């Protein structure tokens, strides 16, 4: 999967073949402020929410700063920026941990695809075991009234599998935390 840097320019027409390396996911996120502002909010929620990945980062796109008339003054363009919750420092994806940029295309796809198939190899690549557990929740935590994507996952992560099995057991035993959806 690619890691966009400061020179990344989103394709205004993301293509199907760009999903294999994550390019189309970054394109969609960069362009989401113009077309689907809910997407960037959902992805940012996955990164910042304590009950999800809890990475202490929010995500913004250059379009959110309302500087379309003269973005060159601040050096911002339609790109994705990570912002640490406890500071105002804006970072490009290549300036944060590799694991965050590797998991972002999966989170983006999970919030775009409905009634489709998302195939991914090693979603656990370069991420901490605690984040791997949250990825297990990403695969299972959808409201029942939402058209869910089907995930085809090739993984070596015991953490992801154990989280999914835990959610299945909690659903079966009626012990699922209130904030979670049944599996």
Where are these regions (language model features)?
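Coupling/switch segment of ABC-type P-loop NTPase heads
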Residues: 1-54
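Short secondary-structure junctions
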Residues: 50-64
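Switch/communication elements of ASCE P-loop NTPase nucleotide-binding domains
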Residues: 36-39, 43-46, 52, 66-183
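A generic structural signal for short, non-catalytic loop/turn and secondary-structure boundary residues
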Residues: 1, 60, 176-179
